[in-house]
Swiss-Prot record:
It comes from Hadronyche infensa (Fraser island funnel-web spider). It is found in: Secreted. Belongs to the neurotoxin 25 family. F7 subfamily. Residues 1-19 form the signal peptide. Keywords: Cleavage on pair of basic residues, Disulfide bond, Ion channel impairing toxin, Knottin, Secreted, Signal, Toxin. Expressed by the venom gland. The presence of a 'disulfide through disulfide knot' structurally defines this protein as a knottin. It comes from the Eukaryota. Contains 4 disulfide bonds. Its main location: secreted. Weak insecticidal toxin with probable ion channel impairing activity. In vivo, induces paralysis when injected into sheep blowflies (L.cuprina). Shows weak toxicity, since it is only toxic at high doses, and flies recover within 24 hours. This is U3-hexatoxin-Hi1a. GO terms for cellular component: extracellular region.
């Protein structure tokens, strides 16, 4: 009985695979060229984006990097509002006082490490 089910499943999979349209070499080459163009465009915009070199944002302001936020314990935090990512400068990591203190200590370490990201 299991062999019969196995045979039916294989038959259906083969039928579905045979029904799918095959791509021609021209279509594959066109998709490859489009991907290469997209990659070149992305790399170009990525390399020309200016990065922050020192703090310029206060608590609550939007940010992209930790080094943009002024303050030893202030970091660029990410929150999701309505499924959309939002970054802002924040020094609060938890509603629990002890965990918040630990989080601020981690923010200090994170700010130190992000200094390398902000050079240039």
């Amino acid at each position: 009985m299991k062999l019969l089910y196995f045979f039916v499943v294989i038959t259906v999979l083969v039928a579905v695979a045979a029904a799918l349209p095959a791509k021609t070499e021209e279509q594959i080459a066109a998709e490859e060229n489009q991907l290469v163009e997209d990659l070149v465009q992305y790399a170009g915009t990525r390399l020309t984006r200016k990065r922050a070199t020192r703090c310029s944002k206060k608590l609550g302001e939007k940010c992209n990097y930790h080094c943009e936020c002024c303050g030893a314990t202030v970091a660029c935090s990410t929150v999701y509002v309505g499924g959309k990512e939002t970054n802002f400068c924040s020094d609060k990591t938890s509603n629990n006082g002890a965990l918040n203190t630990v989080g601020q200590g981690l923010n200090v370490v994170s700010n130190g490490l992000s200094a390398f990201q902000c050079w240039g």
